[in-house]
Swiss-Prot record:
Transmembrane feature ranges: 5-25
GO CC, any one term: plasma membrane
Pfam families documented for this protein: HD (PF01966), KH_1 (PF00013), RNase_Y_N (PF12072)
Family label: Belongs to the RNase Y family.
The enzyme's E.C. designation: 3.1.-.-
Function comment: Endoribonuclease that initiates mRNA decay.
GN (gene name): rny
Native source species: Latilactobacillus sakei subsp. sakei (strain 23K)
Keywords, in A-Z order: Cell membrane, Endonuclease, Hydrolase, Membrane, Nuclease, RNA-binding, Transmembrane, Transmembrane helix
Protein's cellular compartments: Cell membrane
Protein name: Ribonuclease Y
Domain KH: 211-271
Disordered: region residues: 77-107
Top-rank lineage group of the source organism: Bacteria
Amino acid sequence: MNLDLLLILTAVIMLIVGFAVGAILQKKAHEREIDGANKTAKGIIELAEKEAATRKKEILLEAKDENHQYRSEIENELKDRRGEVQKQENRLIQREETMDRKDATLDKKERTLEEHESRLAEQAQQLKEKQAEVETLVEQQRTKLQEIAELSHDDAQKIILDETKRNLDHERAVLIKESEESAKEHADRTAKTLVAEAIQRSAADMVAETTVTVVTLPNDDMKGRIIGREGRNIRTLETLTGIDLIIDDTPEAVVLSGFDPIRREIARMTLEKLIQDGRIHPARIEEMVDKSRKEMDEQIRQIGEQAIFDVGIHTMHPDLIKILGRLHFRTSYGQNVLNHSIEVAKLTGILAAELGEDVTLAKRAGLLHDIGKALDHEVDGSHVEIGVELATRYKEPATVINAIGSHHGDIEATSIISVLVAASDAISAARPGARSESLENYIHRLEKLESITNSFKGVDHSFAIQAGREVRVIVKPEQVTDDQATVLARDVKNQIEDQLEYPGHIKVTVIRETRTVEYAK
């Protein structure tokens, strides 16, 4: 029994010791787990700190990038705004300069008007003084005549009135001369300055078109192929193009004759294509004519676009551009109308710039002033009426329409640009070499000029000289006085302006000559 108790105690002790050892081992294992956990946690913390530092750097870099990008956007926006502000400032400066130029022009015109009014006031005062002197002189002469000649009151009055009339005619002629000379001096000085500068800054080639075109052939055998069997080829070509083909003894050449330059050009293009192709028969001729017409339409469009580009106009209705291109194949007195229109546009733009007007609008009006000539042989009416209708149809500005309608005086000019277009048109048409007239028209104009001057009372005879640029009027000295000669020159000038159409100016010179001959014996 003691042994059993001892075993039980031993077992209990062993169990207690086992529990103790197990507890100790479990505690150590737990401590090891805690140490491992601490190490793991420490590693995680260190890793987290590293990742946090890395993320922090990335966030800082991203923030810096965003800040830099935002700053760049702000700077670009500020730069754009500064540019807009600068553009607005430049526009304001240009407007101020334009206003200054207009103010200067107005001031100059006001000063000129004041000077003219002052001169007129002085002349009016002088006229009053002269009239007072005349009245005094009349009274003195009346008394003297009654005392010395013992004339009746009516006779004396008639003599005095006749002499007074002669004196007043003399005074009127003097005042007219002084006023005209003063106005002409100022106007000529200003106009010459503007026109000279405009002409120096503008240059345009003028090519005198004819009514025939010569096509060169590779050999004379080609003439027979162009004529064709029984003349079928030449008849087909003439029928389709409306142009006469003249085939004569001229070596290696065919002459195309016609008054429509566009048809003549289509015929030339067709004939050259046929010669190059070698196949010449009615069907091929018809095909080539159609092809040449299409090429001609494209060429006309390109010519119109080049014209507005040369002038500096950027927008225009496509149909109006094509009509403008047709002017290249239209002539007036031998002057190419498109080149003339470009020259007028440049001259008008230069003059408008000098006067502070809208340069682009002035060029547009100058370029389109003769647009009606492109269709005047197809549509009834004058080229001015057709031009106004075209400009209205394609919604051109009112200033352009008025310039087209008024450049020949058909309607009243309502703007300065319209006046400048008419002046530039006259400058371009009247300069030497720009235009040529037929001999018949030239002779008729000279005869008409002389007949107008010979129709005035007191004119002995007249001579048109300088190719019709001047007319010299010889008057009868016993019928026309010196003072009346001045008035006669003005009347002849007005009559010429009313009855004749001519480019440029015509100088009227009245010559009064008195000769006294005596013979010594």
